[in-house]
A protein has these predicted regions:
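Short alpha-helical elements of helix-turn-helix
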Residues: 20, 24, 116
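Amphipathic alpha-helical interaction segments
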Residues: 63, 97, 113-117, 165-169, ...
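Helical hydrophobic small-molecule/effector-binding pocket
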Residues: 70, 92-125, 174-178, 208
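Amphipathic alpha-helical linker/stalk segments
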Residues: 10, 69-98, 106, 145-148
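Helix-turn-helix
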Residues: 21, 29-63, 67, 71
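Short helix-capping/turn signature of helix-turn-helix
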Residues: 35, 58, 119-125, 136-137
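Amphipathic alpha-helical packing segments from all-alpha helical-bundle domains
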Residues: 104, 108-113, 117, 127-154, ...
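C-terminal peripheral helix-coil segments that are non-catalytic and often amphipathic
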Residues: 1-9, 97, 101, 143, ...
Length: 212
């Protein structure tokens, strides 16, 4: 897999275990030292791989940054539609699992650090990280979540007029103001760290609004 700066739309990218290990190292460099710390030489040294392998896998530095963000977003998993919508109970479990993984990614140290870094660069015209976090992160996840909800509506498990509106409601119920408080340096409470419990409450409330 080779990723260029232009390849930042919604196509699926499958990383090998070795590539995932390298991208974890890249995330670590970004969190610790910011975007300037993510160099091919530094990553090759930290991940114990050659610069040639990095170029082969990810292309140039923009491609590497795109791959890092795509890898982080890929930690939110989506099941095949046929499996997710087998019955009403299964669909609800998958929706809860999605909300749990979304919270795990958003509330995790890595995501918080990446968002802080992007916010710090928001007044720059070349804020590549911010654009990638939107396109390869937020927009990709929301597009897949809308598709999951549409599948649930098609099977009669949910009722809504607009999938984007329904998703934003679920997002708000699950995330609330916790993410912004984490970005501002506040620690999550013990209750807020119970991600599955928070997701279940959010989905319960969501079904009161949109359950068929």
């Amino acid at each position: 897999m080779s990723l260029s700066a232009a390849d930042i739309e919604f196509e699926e990218i499958a990383f090998t275990p070795r590539q995932e290990a390298v991208l974890e190292c890249a995330l670590g460099l970004l969190v610790e030292g910011g975007e300037k710390a993510l160099t091919t030489a530094g990553l090759a040294r930290t991940a114990n791989c050659s610069k040639e392998s990095l170029y082969k896998w990810f292309g140039d530095r923009d491609g590497l940054l795109a791959a890092v963000v795509a890898y982080q977003a890929s930690k939110v998993h989506f099941p095949p539609e046929s499996g997710a919508t087998a019955d009403a109970g299964t669909f609800r479990k998958h929706l809860t699992a999605f909300a749990t993984e979304l919270l795990a990614v958003l509330f995790g140290e890595t995501s918080v650090a990446l968002n802080r870094l992007s916010i710090g660069q928001s007044n720059r015209d070349d804020n590549r990280l911010g654009r990638l976090l939107l396109v390869r992160g937020k927009h990709m996840i929301s597009a897949k979540a809308r598709a999951l909800m549409e599948a649930g509506r098609h099977r009669g498990y949910l009722k809504f007029d607009d999938a984007e509106e329904a998703y934003q409601v679920l997002y708000g119920l699950a995330v609330r103001d916790v993410h912004i408080r984490l970005l501002l340096g506040e620690k999550a409470s013990e209750e807020e760290r119970d991600l599955n419990g928070q997701a279940e409450v959010a989905v319960d409330r969501f079904y009161k609004l949109f359950g068929a």
